[in-house]
Amino acid sequence: MIPIFFVTFAPKLQIIYIFNMAIIKTVEGKTPQWGKNCFIAENAVLTGDCILGDDCSIWYSAVLRSDVDAIRCGNRVNVQDCACIHQTGTMPCILEDDVSVGHGAIVHGATVREGALIGMNATVLDKAEIGEGAIIAAGAVVTHGTKVPAHEIWAGIPAKKVKACAPGQAEEFAKHYSGYIKDWYLKED
C-alpha cells in the first residue's frame, strides 16, 4: 500500500492508503484489514474498522464504510458492484461466511448470517437480522429490526416471507460466486 497524505478542512491530517488503486482509508486510527486471497477492485472503498476474512471479493464501486462502528466480514464474502455496507453508531454490520451482497444493495447496521444472499438493489436496514441461508429478493426492503428466519425467501417493500428456500438453494449461490473470483480474478497467468 502507498500512503498518500493530504490536507483537508478538517483539523486532522488525513491518511489514505492506495491498494491496487482501491481507497483504503484510516478513520480514528483504524485501518481496514483483509485475509488471504481477497480481491478488492481498483475503485472499491474500504474505511475504518473494517475486517474481511479470507477469499473475499469486493467488486467495482462497492463501499464498505466503517467510520462510527465496525464492519466484520467472514470468509468467502462477496460484495458486488455498487453495493454499500455501512453501520450505525450503536450497531456494527456483520456479514458471516459465504454471504453474497448483490449489485447496488445496501446493508446498514444489520447482521447477515452464514450463506445468506442479499439480492440486487435490496436494502437491509438497522438492527435487521437475515437468517442462515435466507434469500432477500432483488429490490426488497427489510425494515428496521426485522428478523428473517433461516432458509426463507423474502421479497417486497416492506419485505415479507414469500416461501421457504429449496434445499441447497443458498449453497448453490455461494459456490457460484466463490468460483468466479478464483476462475477469473485470482488465477495465475
Positions of predicted regions on the chain:
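Acidic, Ala/Val/Gly-enriched low-complexity intrinsically disordered segments
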Residues: 7-10
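Extended, small-residue-rich solenoid/repeat segments and analogous flexible loops
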Residues: 14-57, 63, 183-189
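Well-ordered, non-transmembrane segments within structured domains
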Residues: 52-75, 80
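Glycine-rich hexapeptide-repeat left-handed beta-helix
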Residues: 22-30, 67, 73-75, 81-87, ...
